[in-house]
Structure formats: C-alpha cells, structure tokens
C-alpha cells in the first residue's frame, strides 16, 4: 500500500546548507527503509563547501538549480541544473557549489549515516 510522506524533517547542519530528509533514518524510521535508502533535498548557499569524504555508500545527485561542484581524485566535475552524477562508495570526494548556490536531491544507497560518510577533519 502506498505511504504518503507528508513532510520532510529538516536536519541542522553548519555552513548555511539546508537538508530536508524525505526518506531515511530520521524522517521515516518506521517505513523499514531507514538503512537501505535515503532521499533528501538540499539547498546550499553561494560559496558553500564541505570537507572531503570517503563514503561507504553510492550517491546519486540530481541538480535542480544552480551548480554543484564535485572534487574527486581525477579532478573536478561541474553539475548544473538538469544534470546528475553518481558517486560510488569508497571514492574520495568533496561537494561545493557555484556562485549562485544550488538546490539538489541526494539519493544514498544504502542510506546516509554520519557513521558511514567518512568525512575528513577540516584543517
């Protein structure tokens, strides 16, 4: 039977980025999906960036507006509105955004967890 997710849960993070989790450990723990998939809508301000990370999950990022920059061992990708990117678990990556900020959807398989993101300490 279909399950309506009436609203996301806003997850507080530093740096001005907004995370609205629709599916995952925080918003839908009773759905039985909390460990298999997470879906969140992100809004990042101009100039936002986060530390490098080596997640143990795959991530699909769909850019809705603006530009997401993805640093990886081979260089940097620019993903703009209407484009998407897939990163694989075990890859060292860093997300940031362009001068207009960005709005995007992140789908993590298995689900995102602070314990499995492998975020590096900022220097």
What label would you give each PLM region?
Residues 1-36, 119-123:
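A short, N-terminal "cap"/entry segment at the start of jelly-roll beta-barrel domains
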Residues 23-28, 38-55:
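Conserved short histidine dyad/triad with adjacent acidic residue
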Residues 30-34, 49-55, 72, 96-97:
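Short histidine-centered beta-strand/loop micro-motifs
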Residues 41-44, 54-70:
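Short, conserved beta-strand element in jelly-roll/cupin
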Residues 67-69, 76, 92, 101:
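Structural motif
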Residues 74-90:
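Short acidic-glycine-tyrosine-enriched beta hairpin
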Residues 89-114:
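Ligand-binding loop in jelly-roll beta-barrel domains
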């Amino acid at each position: 039977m279909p399950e309506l997710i009436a609203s996301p849960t806003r997850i507080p993070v530093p740096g001005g980025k907004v995370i609205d989790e629709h599916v995952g450990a925080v918003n839908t723990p009773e759905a039985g999906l909390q460990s298999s998939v997470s879906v969140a809508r992100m809004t990042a301000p101009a100039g936002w960036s986060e530390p490098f990370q080596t997640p143990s999950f795959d991530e699909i990022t769909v850019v809705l507006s603006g530009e997401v920059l993805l640093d990886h061992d081979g260089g940097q990708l620019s993903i703009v509105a209407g484009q998407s990117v897939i990163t694989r678990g075990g890859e060292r990556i860093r997300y940031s955004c362009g001068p207009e900020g960005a709005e995007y959807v992140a789908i993590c398989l298995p689900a995102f967890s602070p314990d499995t993101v492998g975020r590096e300490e900022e220097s």
